[in-house]
Amino acid sequence: MRFTNKTVLITGAAGGIGRQTGLSFAKEGANVVVTDLDFDMAKRVADEIQSAGGSSEPFKLDVTNQDETIETMNNAYKHFGSLDVAFCNAGIREIVSPLELSIEEWRKVIDINVTGVFITAQTFAKHCINNKTKGNIVITSSTLSITSAPNRCAYTASKHATAGMTKQLAMDLAKYDIRVNAVRPGVIRTPLTERYFQDEEASQKVRNLHAMKRWGEPNEISSAVLYLASEEASFCTGTNLIVDGGWTEGKDW
């Protein structure tokens, strides 16, 4: 198994892509640190991993709180004895006209999607450097890191920012043997996107966004995350791995 004796910390791990990635890492032998703002949901995922025979520990984490992030990583390291991968997955999005988008909502999206990713990545990198261990950071990106969509101004801006952050962190952290990559999903069916699937017309529109004429499933993203975090991708850093079913080639607004 690719991650035996490795410890993986996942933010936004309570549902959708985060949950599935936690299960996938555990299946490959990893200790999984399940973090989320919703502790009850994080515990549920950790219990699910443990019930399947995996090793996991839940933590409540607000990714915008630097002190809390430092404490969580320190506690995870004390509990498992290592910290090898950080999957920066926590994120939110808005669907509202930019003319009606409040500054409070703008700041919330940017704070979680950009500042939260930076805090997680920076804290993890410092941990690796202080402990003289190599590390892997994987960031959940989006097709909107290179394009746009109606009424998602803050979200699109945040994903463009994290795309640049991925490249810059990869350049700056390579000398410490820390790789930084991102995965760029198309529309994945998760609790966050469930509103797209409420009727046939909406579902068909989602299909038409992709050249493959279907939406993605969380396991199709978790497979990409595990690849980027594994030794199979040992010469890969600064990349944004596209897993979008041909979204950028086949979208039809």
Language-model segments: what does each one mean?
Residues S97-P98, S102-I110, V206:
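Substrate-binding pocket helix/loop in short-chain dehydrogenase/reductase
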Residues T147, L226, T237-W253:
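Short C-terminal tail/terminal secondary-structure segment
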Residues F3-V33:
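Canonical Rossmann dinucleotide-binding motif of NAD(H)/NADP(H)-dependent dehydrogenases/reductases
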Residues K126, M171-K175, S234:
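Alpha-helical segment proximal to the catalytic Tyr-Lys
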Residues A121, S158, T166:
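Active-site helix of classical SDR
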Residues F87, A174, R179, C236-G238:
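Short, small/polar-rich loop/turn modules that mediate ligand/substrate recognition or access, typified
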